[in-house]
Protein backbone atom coordinates (compact mmCIF):
# COMPACT_ATOMS: atom_id res chain seq x y z
CA UNK A 1 0.00 0.00 0.00
CA UNK A 2 2.72 2.42 0.87
CA UNK A 3 4.33 4.20 -2.07
CA UNK A 4 8.00 5.07 -1.97
CA UNK A 5 9.66 7.13 -4.66
CA UNK A 6 12.34 9.60 -5.73
CA UNK A 7 13.59 11.63 -2.81
CA UNK A 8 13.27 15.31 -2.08
CA UNK A 9 14.58 17.07 1.02
CA UNK A 10 12.42 19.74 2.64
CA UNK A 11 13.57 23.15 1.50
CA UNK A 12 14.22 22.22 -2.13
CA UNK A 13 11.99 24.23 -4.44
CA UNK A 14 8.81 22.39 -5.38
CA UNK A 15 7.39 23.77 -8.60
CA UNK A 16 3.96 22.18 -8.27
CA UNK A 17 1.23 24.12 -6.41
CA UNK A 18 0.79 23.36 -2.72
CA UNK A 19 -2.52 21.53 -2.20
CA UNK A 20 -2.51 21.07 1.55
CA UNK A 21 -0.41 21.72 4.62
CA UNK A 22 -1.33 20.22 7.96
CA UNK A 23 -0.05 19.01 11.30
CA UNK A 24 -0.36 15.31 12.08
CA UNK A 25 0.67 14.43 15.59
CA UNK A 26 4.15 15.85 16.14
CA UNK A 27 5.16 16.62 12.56
CA UNK A 28 4.08 18.60 9.50
CA UNK A 29 2.91 17.41 6.10
CA UNK A 30 2.93 19.28 2.79
CA UNK A 31 1.05 17.86 -0.18
CA UNK A 32 1.66 19.14 -3.71
CA UNK A 33 -0.39 18.94 -6.90
CA UNK A 34 2.06 16.61 -8.67
CA UNK A 35 1.71 13.94 -5.97
CA UNK A 36 4.75 14.98 -3.96
CA UNK A 37 4.36 14.69 -0.21
CA UNK A 38 6.88 16.04 2.29
CA UNK A 39 7.02 15.21 5.99
CA UNK A 40 9.17 17.25 8.34
CA UNK A 41 9.56 18.04 12.02
CA UNK A 42 12.09 18.65 14.79
CA UNK A 43 11.31 15.57 16.86
CA UNK A 44 12.96 12.29 17.73
CA UNK A 45 10.39 10.31 15.76
CA UNK A 46 7.31 10.99 13.67
CA UNK A 47 4.15 9.98 15.54
CA UNK A 48 0.95 10.56 13.54
CA UNK A 49 -2.49 10.85 15.13
CA UNK A 50 -4.32 9.82 11.97
CA UNK A 51 -3.42 8.04 8.72
CA UNK A 52 -2.10 10.10 5.86
CA UNK A 53 -3.30 7.54 3.33
CA UNK A 54 -6.07 4.95 3.42
CA UNK A 55 -6.61 2.27 0.81
CA UNK A 56 -10.36 1.66 0.54
CA UNK A 57 -12.20 -1.15 -1.18
CA UNK A 58 -15.70 0.26 -1.80
CA UNK A 59 -16.98 -2.51 -4.08
CA UNK A 60 -16.29 -6.04 -5.23
CA UNK A 61 -18.53 -5.68 -8.25
CA UNK A 62 -16.38 -5.61 -11.38
CA UNK A 63 -16.62 -7.03 -14.89
CA UNK A 64 -12.86 -6.95 -15.45
CA UNK A 65 -12.36 -10.62 -14.62
CA UNK A 66 -8.63 -10.22 -13.94
CA UNK A 67 -7.29 -13.70 -13.11
CA UNK A 68 -4.88 -12.21 -10.54
CA UNK A 69 -7.42 -9.97 -8.74
CA UNK A 70 -6.46 -10.10 -5.06
CA UNK A 71 -9.83 -8.65 -3.95
CA UNK A 72 -11.73 -11.44 -5.71
CA UNK A 73 -14.05 -9.02 -7.52
CA UNK A 74 -16.80 -10.47 -9.74
CA UNK A 75 -19.65 -9.17 -11.84
CA UNK A 76 -22.02 -10.15 -9.01
CA UNK A 77 -19.92 -8.64 -6.21
CA UNK A 78 -21.37 -6.39 -3.50
CA UNK A 79 -21.02 -2.66 -2.93
CA UNK A 80 -19.84 -1.17 0.36
CA UNK A 81 -21.81 1.44 2.28
CA UNK A 82 -20.70 5.04 1.68
CA UNK A 83 -23.76 7.07 2.68
CA UNK A 84 -26.23 6.90 5.55
CA UNK A 85 -30.02 7.05 5.24
CA UNK A 86 -29.89 10.85 4.95
CA UNK A 87 -27.47 10.84 2.04
CA UNK A 88 -24.53 11.91 4.22
CA UNK A 89 -21.18 10.18 4.64
CA UNK A 90 -21.15 7.20 6.98
CA UNK A 91 -19.52 7.63 10.38
CA UNK A 92 -15.93 6.64 9.64
CA UNK A 93 -15.86 8.86 6.56
CA UNK A 94 -17.24 11.74 8.61
CA UNK A 95 -14.23 11.37 10.91
CA UNK A 96 -11.63 11.83 8.15
CA UNK A 97 -9.21 14.74 8.56
CA UNK A 98 -8.60 17.41 5.89
CA UNK A 99 -5.55 16.50 3.84
CA UNK A 100 -6.08 12.75 4.18
CA UNK A 101 -5.73 10.82 0.93
CA UNK A 102 -8.13 8.02 0.07
CA UNK A 103 -7.19 5.49 -2.60
CA UNK A 104 -10.37 3.91 -3.98
CA UNK A 105 -9.69 0.54 -5.55
CA UNK A 106 -11.63 -1.96 -7.63
CA UNK A 107 -14.23 -0.84 -10.14
CA UNK A 108 -15.33 2.10 -7.98
CA UNK A 109 -17.08 3.64 -11.00
CA UNK A 110 -19.82 1.04 -10.66
CA UNK A 111 -20.82 2.22 -7.16
CA UNK A 112 -24.20 4.03 -7.27
CA UNK A 113 -23.33 6.45 -4.44
CA UNK A 114 -19.82 7.29 -5.59
CA UNK A 115 -20.39 10.75 -7.05
CA UNK A 116 -22.35 11.99 -4.02
CA UNK A 117 -19.62 10.63 -1.73
CA UNK A 118 -16.92 12.34 -3.80
CA UNK A 119 -18.70 15.68 -3.49
CA UNK A 120 -18.94 15.34 0.30
CA UNK A 121 -15.31 14.22 0.61
CA UNK A 122 -14.17 17.22 -1.41
CA UNK A 123 -16.10 19.48 0.98
CA UNK A 124 -14.18 17.90 3.88
CA UNK A 125 -10.83 18.61 2.23
CA UNK A 126 -10.12 14.92 1.63
CA UNK A 127 -8.15 14.06 -1.51
CA UNK A 128 -9.47 11.06 -3.43
CA UNK A 129 -7.24 9.03 -5.72
CA UNK A 130 -9.09 6.52 -7.87
CA UNK A 131 -7.66 3.39 -9.42
CA UNK A 132 -9.43 1.91 -12.42
CA UNK A 133 -8.74 -0.93 -14.80
CA UNK A 134 -7.47 0.17 -18.20
CA UNK A 135 -10.55 -1.40 -19.81
CA UNK A 136 -12.78 1.10 -17.95
CA UNK A 137 -10.83 4.20 -19.00
CA UNK A 138 -12.25 4.88 -22.47
CA UNK A 139 -15.91 4.09 -21.63
CA UNK A 140 -15.76 6.46 -18.63
CA UNK A 141 -13.41 9.01 -20.16
CA UNK A 142 -15.78 12.00 -20.09
CA UNK A 143 -16.97 11.29 -16.54
CA UNK A 144 -13.47 10.86 -15.13
CA UNK A 145 -12.19 13.98 -16.85
CA UNK A 146 -15.15 15.97 -15.53
CA UNK A 147 -14.57 14.67 -11.99
CA UNK A 148 -10.91 15.57 -12.08
CA UNK A 149 -11.62 19.06 -13.42
CA UNK A 150 -14.15 19.57 -10.60
CA UNK A 151 -11.69 18.34 -7.98
CA UNK A 152 -13.79 15.30 -7.07
CA UNK A 153 -10.83 13.07 -7.79
CA UNK A 154 -7.26 14.24 -7.46
CA UNK A 155 -5.10 11.43 -8.81
CA UNK A 156 -6.01 8.75 -11.34
CA UNK A 157 -4.37 5.35 -11.23
CA UNK A 158 -4.79 3.14 -14.28
CA UNK A 159 -4.05 -0.57 -13.94
CA UNK A 160 -2.23 -1.54 -17.11
CA UNK A 161 -3.64 -4.38 -19.19
CA UNK A 162 -2.51 -3.64 -22.74
CA UNK A 163 0.58 -1.49 -23.28
CA UNK A 164 0.02 -1.44 -27.05
CA UNK A 165 -3.46 0.10 -27.01
CA UNK A 166 -3.65 3.31 -29.05
CA UNK A 167 -6.93 4.23 -27.33
CA UNK A 168 -5.21 4.03 -23.94
CA UNK A 169 -2.47 6.46 -24.96
CA UNK A 170 -4.98 8.83 -26.55
CA UNK A 171 -7.09 8.96 -23.38
CA UNK A 172 -4.35 9.09 -20.78
CA UNK A 173 -2.71 12.27 -22.05
CA UNK A 174 -5.78 14.33 -21.10
CA UNK A 175 -5.46 13.66 -17.36
CA UNK A 176 -3.17 15.26 -14.81
CA UNK A 177 -1.55 13.43 -11.91
CA UNK A 178 -1.89 10.03 -13.59
CA UNK A 179 0.01 7.00 -12.38
CA UNK A 180 0.20 3.77 -14.36
CA UNK A 181 -0.22 0.81 -12.01
CA UNK A 182 1.77 -2.32 -12.75
CA UNK A 183 2.23 -5.58 -10.86
CA UNK A 184 5.58 -7.25 -10.29
CA UNK A 185 5.35 -10.66 -11.93
CA UNK A 186 2.69 -9.55 -14.40
CA UNK A 187 4.30 -6.51 -16.03
CA UNK A 188 6.93 -7.31 -18.65
CA UNK A 189 10.00 -5.40 -19.73
CA UNK A 190 8.36 -4.97 -23.15
CA UNK A 191 5.36 -3.31 -21.48
CA UNK A 192 7.61 -0.81 -19.72
CA UNK A 193 9.48 -0.04 -22.93
CA UNK A 194 6.14 0.68 -24.62
CA UNK A 195 5.13 3.03 -21.79
CA UNK A 196 8.32 5.03 -22.23
CA UNK A 197 6.76 6.81 -25.21
CA UNK A 198 4.56 8.88 -22.87
CA UNK A 199 7.05 9.01 -19.97
CA UNK A 200 4.41 8.49 -17.26
CA UNK A 201 4.64 8.03 -13.52
CA UNK A 202 4.72 4.30 -12.84
CA UNK A 203 3.76 2.49 -9.66
CA UNK A 204 5.08 -1.04 -9.22
CA UNK A 205 2.92 -3.08 -6.89
CA UNK A 206 3.97 -6.35 -5.35
CA UNK A 207 2.22 -9.56 -6.38
CA UNK A 208 -0.40 -10.26 -3.71
CA UNK A 209 -0.83 -14.00 -3.36
CA UNK A 210 -4.42 -13.85 -2.13
CA UNK A 211 -7.84 -13.97 -3.78
CA UNK A 212 -7.77 -15.20 -7.38
CA UNK A 213 -4.09 -14.29 -7.51
CA UNK A 214 -3.31 -17.35 -5.38
CA UNK A 215 -4.66 -19.78 -7.98
CA UNK A 216 -3.09 -17.78 -10.80
CA UNK A 217 0.32 -18.03 -9.16
CA UNK A 218 -0.02 -21.80 -8.84
CA UNK A 219 -0.53 -22.13 -12.59
CA UNK A 220 1.88 -19.41 -13.70
CA UNK A 221 4.66 -19.56 -11.10
CA UNK A 222 7.50 -19.76 -13.63
CA UNK A 223 6.15 -16.86 -15.68
CA UNK A 224 5.71 -14.68 -12.59
CA UNK A 225 9.22 -15.37 -11.35
CA UNK A 226 10.68 -14.78 -14.82
CA UNK A 227 8.97 -11.39 -15.07
CA UNK A 228 10.19 -10.41 -11.60
CA UNK A 229 13.78 -11.37 -12.40
CA UNK A 230 13.65 -9.52 -15.73
CA UNK A 231 12.33 -6.44 -13.95
CA UNK A 232 15.17 -6.61 -11.43
CA UNK A 233 17.71 -6.70 -14.24
CA UNK A 234 16.23 -3.79 -16.19
CA UNK A 235 14.83 -1.51 -13.49
CA UNK A 236 18.10 0.31 -12.71
CA UNK A 237 18.52 1.07 -16.42
CA UNK A 238 14.95 2.37 -16.74
CA UNK A 239 15.49 4.73 -13.82
CA UNK A 240 19.00 5.84 -14.80
CA UNK A 241 17.84 6.66 -18.34
CA UNK A 242 14.71 8.44 -17.06
CA UNK A 243 12.25 6.30 -18.99
CA UNK A 244 9.52 7.59 -16.68
CA UNK A 245 8.75 10.86 -14.91
CA UNK A 246 8.67 8.95 -11.62
CA UNK A 247 8.83 5.38 -10.37
CA UNK A 248 7.35 4.33 -7.05
CA UNK A 249 6.78 1.05 -5.24
CA UNK A 250 4.58 -0.34 -2.54
CA UNK A 251 6.28 -2.19 0.30
CA UNK A 252 5.45 -5.60 -1.11
CA UNK A 253 7.19 -4.75 -4.38
CA UNK A 254 10.17 -3.41 -2.44
CA UNK A 255 10.53 -6.84 -0.83
CA UNK A 256 9.89 -8.88 -3.97
CA UNK A 257 12.26 -6.80 -6.12
CA UNK A 258 14.83 -6.30 -3.34
CA UNK A 259 14.76 -2.58 -4.11
CA UNK A 260 17.10 -1.67 -1.25
CA UNK A 261 19.99 -3.69 -2.69
CA UNK A 262 18.96 -3.05 -6.28
CA UNK A 263 18.85 0.75 -6.12
CA UNK A 264 20.40 1.75 -2.79
CA UNK A 265 23.29 -0.64 -2.24
CA UNK A 266 25.89 1.07 -0.03
CA UNK A 267 23.64 4.13 0.13
CA UNK A 268 21.96 3.98 3.52
CA UNK A 269 21.23 7.70 3.53
CA UNK A 270 19.47 7.47 0.19
CA UNK A 271 17.47 4.48 1.39
CA UNK A 272 16.42 6.25 4.58
CA UNK A 273 15.18 9.18 2.52
CA UNK A 274 13.40 6.92 0.03
CA UNK A 275 11.63 4.52 2.37
CA UNK A 276 8.32 5.88 3.68
CA UNK A 277 7.93 3.44 6.55
CA UNK A 278 6.21 0.15 7.23
CA UNK A 279 2.55 -0.39 6.41
CA UNK A 280 0.50 0.77 9.36
CA UNK A 281 2.93 3.47 10.42
CA UNK A 282 1.20 6.20 8.40
CA UNK A 283 -1.35 4.19 6.42
CA UNK A 284 -4.13 1.64 6.76
CA UNK A 285 -6.70 -0.33 4.77
CA UNK A 286 -10.49 -0.23 5.01
CA UNK A 287 -12.78 -2.82 3.45
CA UNK A 288 -16.06 -0.93 3.13
CA UNK A 289 -17.77 -3.99 1.66
CA UNK A 290 -17.11 -6.14 4.73
CA UNK A 291 -17.05 -3.15 7.14
CA UNK A 292 -13.60 -4.09 8.41
CA UNK A 293 -10.15 -2.51 8.66
CA UNK A 294 -6.58 -3.78 8.68
CA UNK A 295 -2.95 -2.79 8.42
CA UNK A 296 -3.03 -3.46 4.67
CA UNK A 297 -5.03 -5.36 2.08
CA UNK A 298 -2.87 -8.50 2.39
CA UNK A 299 -3.92 -9.26 5.96
CA UNK A 300 -5.73 -12.49 6.78
CA UNK A 301 -9.35 -12.58 7.96
CA UNK A 302 -8.09 -13.00 11.53
CA UNK A 303 -6.14 -9.74 11.22
CA UNK A 304 -9.08 -7.70 9.90
CA UNK A 305 -11.16 -5.97 12.54
CA UNK A 306 -14.79 -4.85 12.69
CA UNK A 307 -15.28 -1.12 12.22
CA UNK A 308 -18.57 -0.91 14.14
CA UNK A 309 -18.78 2.77 15.19
CA UNK A 310 -15.05 3.45 15.38
CA UNK A 311 -13.60 6.67 14.02
CA UNK A 312 -10.62 6.63 11.68
CA UNK A 313 -8.43 7.87 14.54
CA UNK A 314 -9.54 4.96 16.74
CA UNK A 315 -8.93 2.40 14.01
CA UNK A 316 -5.52 3.84 13.22
CA UNK A 317 -4.49 3.90 16.87
CA UNK A 318 -5.39 0.21 17.10
CA UNK A 319 -3.31 -0.55 14.00
CA UNK A 320 -0.29 1.33 15.33
CA UNK A 321 -0.60 -0.16 18.81
CA UNK A 322 -0.78 -3.63 17.29
CA UNK A 323 1.87 -3.51 14.57
CA UNK A 324 4.16 -0.50 14.74
CA UNK A 325 7.32 -0.87 16.79
CA UNK A 326 9.31 1.86 18.50
CA UNK A 327 11.58 2.46 15.53
CA UNK A 328 10.32 5.40 13.52
CA UNK A 329 11.71 7.68 10.84
CA UNK A 330 14.51 10.10 11.62
CA UNK A 331 13.16 13.65 11.94
CA UNK A 332 16.08 15.05 9.96
CA UNK A 333 14.86 13.26 6.83
CA UNK A 334 11.93 14.60 4.86
CA UNK A 335 10.07 11.95 2.91
CA UNK A 336 8.38 12.05 -0.42
CA UNK A 337 5.69 9.84 -1.86
CA UNK A 338 3.69 9.90 -5.06
CA UNK A 339 0.20 8.85 -4.08
CA UNK A 340 -2.37 8.12 -6.62
CA UNK A 341 -4.83 5.32 -6.03
CA UNK A 342 -3.53 1.70 -5.15
CA UNK A 343 -4.62 -1.19 -6.65
Give residue ranges: language-model regions.
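N-terminal [4Fe-4S]-dependent radical SAM core
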Residues: 1-56, 73, 268-271, 331-341
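Alpha-helical scaffolding segments of alpha/beta enzyme cores, especially the outer helices
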Residues: 88-91, 113-123, 143, 167-170, ...
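Radical SAM enzyme [4Fe-4S]-AdoMet core and its adjacent flexible, acidic
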Residues: 152-310, 315
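Membrane-interface junctions of multi-pass transporters
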Residues: 296-343
